[in-house]
Amino acid sequence: MIICKTPRELGIMREAGRIVALTHEELKKHIKPGISTKELDQIAERFIKKQGAIPSFKGYNGFRGSICVSVNEELVHGIPGSRVLKDGDIISIDIGAKLNGYHGDSAWTYPVGNISDDDKKLLEVTEESLYKGLQEAKPGERLSNISHAIQTYVENEQFSVVREYVGHGVGQDLHEDPQIPHYGPPNKGPRLKPGMVLAIEPMVNAGSRYVKTLADNWTVVTVDGKKCAHFEHTIAITETGFDILTRV
């Protein structure tokens, strides 16, 4: 069931989203060669708690980190640990913050030091695909128009959209209905209504679209070992369009 949020709930979620955005800004200062993914996790946890929220992901289905940290060929759900970032890496950081019972959720992929032109293009296309999808986020539109816009743009740029992992509703639960694929035909699915809160999060591979989960039962990687990127915003559908909740 899709739960439309009240103005009061949206106010809380806007603040939760702002905390997520501020946490991204804080981590961005520290993303450089020589730092470990565990150190980034610790910085994020301290910062989120300082804002009066709690990390959404810590303990979620047994997840050990406060954030998901995925490097290079790792797509999503990377567990923070001893891995040290190197010049030329790309790192996807997925952050959730829970405030007064409601979640904010946003992911960004960052360059570490100097990255290749190919990796720059991967990041640019993935981020732009998010905004191509958001252009379709209007009341009365079908949900799959978002999906179709993302897939069309990504594939026209000669990249691949991951199909096993999808966007989702957000609220008192981190993952609510509806599920939002980032591929598919237009004009399908429920019509968007004011008060819906959605996490749109295209995951894009430089090579084939296929992924697998490692033995830790969390970290998802590309099958071909090529790099991948992930960009996500939590948005609210309004009377006239959408409002990005996960920004300052």
UniProtKB/Swiss-Prot annotation:
A molecular function GO annotation: metal ion binding
Subcellular localization, as worded in the UniProt entry: Cytoplasm
Domain of life: Bacteria
Major location category of this protein: cytoplasm
Binding site for a divalent metal cation 2: D105, H168, E201, E232
Biological role stated in the UniProt entry: Removes the N-terminal methionine from nascent proteins. The N-terminal methionine is often cleaved when the second residue in the primary sequence is small and uncharged (Met-Ala-, Cys, Gly, Pro, Ser, Thr, or Val). Requires deformylation of the N(alpha)-formylated initiator methionine before it can be hydrolyzed.
Binding of a divalent metal cation 1, residues: D94, D105, E232
EC number: 3.4.11.18
Species of the source: Bacillus subtilis (strain 168)
Cofactor(s) in the UniProt record: Co(2+); Zn(2+); Mn(2+); Fe(2+)
Annotated Pfam families: Peptidase_M24 (PF00557)
Protein name per Swiss-Prot or TrEMBL: Methionine aminopeptidase 1
Binding residue positions for substrate: H77, H175
Subunit structure: Monomer.
Induction field: Expression increases gradually during the log phase of growth.
Cofactor note: Binds 2 divalent metal cations per subunit. Has a high-affinity and a low affinity metal-binding site. The true nature of the physiological cofactor is under debate. The enzyme is active with cobalt, zinc, manganese or divalent iron ions. Most likely, methionine aminopeptidases function as mononuclear Fe(2+)-metalloproteases under physiological conditions, and the catalytically relevant metal-binding site has been assigned to the histidine-containing high-affinity site.
Keyword terms: Aminopeptidase, Cytoplasm, Hydrolase, Metal-binding, Protease
GO biological process, one term: proteolysis
Reaction equations catalysed: Release of N-terminal amino acids, preferentially methionine, from peptides and arylamides
